[in-house]
């Protein structure tokens, strides 16, 4: 028999309630695991209720990832174009958050004319809609897949392919982590901030981080995160954070 391990298991309250609707089926599934390693205390408790016998909680294993070496770093020609830019990212954004970030960009630009905002939407199929939304503010927008359209006047770069986030966290001073200001997603809010935090970024986020409360509380104690409630607060925080450039690794 090959041992079956559930690694870095995370169950949100929403997911747990779904499993409870088919509790007998859930117990049949989860009892097949020889070991479950939970990513947080809440998940550990939910797994116990679902019948898991052997549970360990070592915390979120994403903290153990080595992000010091980023594979496939950004193209040198692109890096040369942005070498004098003040860069921040809006990552894992959801509907409504991109427009909020664009408004903040305009306010920050009054202070730093060389600011570059990089938007990494959670779902890249939304990029064309985001583009139309941002152009309504008369912003110069470029796509990562079409870097020939990127120049010194570009305000916002939209990342329209998956698996690129770490490259941009590596050059950004701070990151707004999305799914935290969309009021329609309060019951299923928040995205994981560990990766940008490990790459030395200040984490800005809205008040709604339900799915990752434990992680945000931990990072807050370390002084890594800051909660903002609207685009004005985001703008003020960005102006403060972008005073100095990100230290080179």
Q: How would you name each of these model-derived features?
A:
Residues 1-249:
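Nucleotide-activated sugar donor-binding and catalytic core shared by glycosyltransferases
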């Amino acid at each position: 028999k090959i041992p079956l391990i559930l690694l870095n298991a995370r169950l949100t309250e929403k997911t747990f309630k779904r499993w409870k609707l088919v509790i007998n089926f859930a117990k049949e599934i989860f009892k097949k695991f020889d070991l479950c390693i939970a990513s947080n205390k809440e998940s550990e408790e939910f797994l116990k209720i679902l019948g898991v016998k052997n549970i360990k909680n070592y915390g979120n294993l994403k903290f153990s990832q080595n992000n010091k070496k980023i594979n496939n770093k950004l193209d040198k020609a692109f890096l040369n174009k942005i070498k004098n830019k003040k860069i921040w990212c809006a990552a894992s954004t959801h509907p409504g958050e991109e427009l909020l970030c664009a408004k903040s960009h305009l306010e920050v630009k009054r202070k730093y004319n060389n600011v570059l905002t990089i938007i990494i939407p959670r779902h890249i199929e939304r990029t064309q809609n985001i583009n139309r939304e941002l152009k309504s503010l008369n912003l110069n927008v470029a796509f990562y897949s079409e870097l020939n359209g990127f120049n010194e006047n570009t305000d916002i770069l939209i990342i329209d392919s998956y698996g690129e986030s770490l490259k941009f966290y590596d050059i950004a001073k701070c990151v707004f982590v999305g799914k935290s200001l969309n009021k329609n997603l309060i019951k299923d809010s928040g995205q994981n901030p560990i990766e940008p935090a490990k790459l030395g970024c200040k984490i800005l986020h809205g008040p709604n981080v339900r799915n990752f409360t434990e992680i945000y509380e931990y990072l807050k104690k370390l002084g890594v995160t800051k909660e903002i409630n609207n685009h004005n607060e985001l703008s003020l925080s960005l102006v403060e954070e972008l005073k100095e450039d990100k230290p080179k690794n």
